[in-house]
Amino acid sequence: MSLNRQEKAVVIEEVSAAVAKAQSIVIAEYRGLDVASVTVLRKTARESGVYLRVLKNTLARRAVAGTAFEPLSEQLTGPLIYGISEDPVSAAKVLAGFAKSNDKLVIKAGSLPNNLLNQEGVKALATMPSREELLSKLLGTMQAPIAQFVRTLNEVPTKFARGLAAVRDQKAAA
């Protein structure tokens, strides 16, 4: 189904808005994927906050023109699905994870702002922890000394109470 000029302008505007907020874009060739597989991929992407879209490559080129993702336009050939994410690793994780279980989805390239990634770069990006995971690790590291200090402070009255209970038990037994 072909789009008229107004529809194309709307699509370009929508994708340009997503690209303007994006921290990463990953493209993959989806040749041979059935509808059920694409539906599962879309559901996974939606849950991860990844904007996933099949676009004509010329429309995608226009959407990334003049942005930090412009170097990606050289890679736009063939039937591609675009994963656009505000988190630098989410799109790579979703598409690389799906590509592991479904060999018909082939990751072609990816891009961080002003940085083009090849297939291996996207797979390496997918293995990195997300921002939320890094923040939770940092928070755990920051809380550990405080929690240990609180447990140590709590141990003094606990030992005292155990000592009193032992004296009470001795006197009760005598």
UniProtKB/Swiss-Prot annotation:
The lineage of its organism: Bacteria, Pseudomonadati, Pseudomonadota, Betaproteobacteria, Burkholderiales. Coiled coil: none annotated. Belongs to the universal ribosomal protein uL10 family. Keywords: Ribonucleoprotein, Ribosomal protein, RNA-binding, rRNA-binding. GO terms for cellular component: large ribosomal subunit. It comes from the Bacteria. Part of the ribosomal stalk of the 50S ribosomal subunit. The N-terminus interacts with L11 and the large rRNA to form the base of the stalk. The C-terminus forms an elongated spine to which L12 dimers bind in a sequential fashion forming a multimeric L10(L12)X complex. HAMAP family: Ribosomal_uL10 (MF_00362). Forms part of the ribosomal stalk, playing a central role in the interaction of the ribosome with GTP-bound translation factors. InterPro entries: Ribosomal_uL10 (IPR001790), Ribosomal_uL10-like_sf (IPR043141), Ribosomal_uL10_bac (IPR022973), Ribosomal_uL10_bac_type (IPR047865), Ribosomal_uL10_CS_bac (IPR002363). This is Large ribosomal subunit protein uL10. GO terms for biological process: translation. It comes from Bordetella petrii (strain ATCC BAA-461 / DSM 12804 / CCUG 43448). Transmembrane segments: none annotated. One of its GO terms (molecular function) is structural constituent of ribosome. It holds the Pfam family Ribosomal_L10.
